[in-house]
């Protein structure tokens, strides 16, 4: 009997019964991928979601308190925080503890340099900053030190100086999905990259530019 009691305690923790009926309904829908939370104040909800909720359940969060983030980062999968438009240093310190696949922060349109210097310490496989359209050379140099896969898929027409900084990236891959074409100076910088380079927005190169990539690593 004691063994049976322990079994039920493991599967149905006491805290589960203290959720409101509205919270329980939201959790059931989230498990089926049919509900996205905009705000979470209860760490128990975050803990439940990260283990049993669908991956999109937290994608709509517009604000995250550090005590909530400490639970969310425990997922071994990608953490998609598409609703977050601003993070400070305290939240960044929590998010970099994510050790899963990719950390998606694609709704950040600007990130303070101090926060970038924290984000590059992210311990997961990849970092996606798909909302940033412009970078300074200094910011590009900081991002280049990130050791995982780096995605900057909204970066618009970076000049050769910024690309010169980015191609120093030491991680496995660099994705610049918004580039529609390449000038020769841009191509001359990008060919120096030694990882996997993803330029999915380019459908056709100007005449002669492809020659710049003749010796690009395969």
Label every PLM stretch briefly.
Residues 3, 7-13, 31-41, 51-64, ...:
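Concave beta-strand-loop units of leucine-rich repeat
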Residues 16, 27-29, 113:
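Leucine-biased recognition of intrinsically disordered, low-complexity hydrophobic segments
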Residues 23, 45, 68, 90-91, ...:
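The leucine-rich repeat
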Residues 26, 36-46, 163:
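Disulfide-bonded cysteine-rich modules in secreted/extracellular proteins
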Residues 16, 209-210:
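A generic alpha-helix propensity feature with a strong bias for hydrophobic helices
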Residues 1-2, 16, 24:
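A detector of long low-complexity, disordered segments enriched in serine/threonine/proline
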């Amino acid at each position: 009997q004691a063994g049976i009691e322990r079994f039920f305690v493991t599967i149905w923790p006491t805290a589960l019964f203290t959720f409101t009926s509205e919270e329980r309904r939201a959790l059931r829908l989230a498990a089926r991928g049919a509900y996205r939370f905009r705000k979470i104040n209860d760490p128990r909800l975050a803990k439940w979601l990260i283990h049993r909720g669908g991956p999109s359940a937290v994608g709509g969060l517009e604000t995250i308190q550090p005590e909530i983030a400490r639970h969310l980062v425990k997922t071994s999968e990608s953490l998609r925080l598409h609703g977050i438009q601003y993070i400070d240093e305290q939240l960044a310190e929590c998010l970099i503890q994510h050790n899963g696949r990719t950390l998606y922060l694609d709704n950040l349109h600007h990130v303070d340099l101090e926060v970038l210097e924290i984000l590059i310490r992210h311990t997961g496989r990849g970092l996606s900053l798909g909302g940033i359209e412009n970078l300074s050379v200094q910011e590009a140099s900081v991002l280049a030190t990130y050791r995982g896969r780096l995605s900057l898929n909204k970066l618009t027409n970076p000049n050769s100086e910024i690309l010169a900084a980015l191609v120093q990236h030491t991680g496995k891959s660099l994705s610049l999905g918004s580039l529609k074409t390449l000038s020769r100076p841009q191509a001359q910088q990008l060919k120096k990259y030694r990882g996997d380079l993803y330029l999915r927005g380019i459908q056709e190169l100007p005449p002669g530019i492809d020659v710049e990539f003749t010796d690009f690593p395969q």
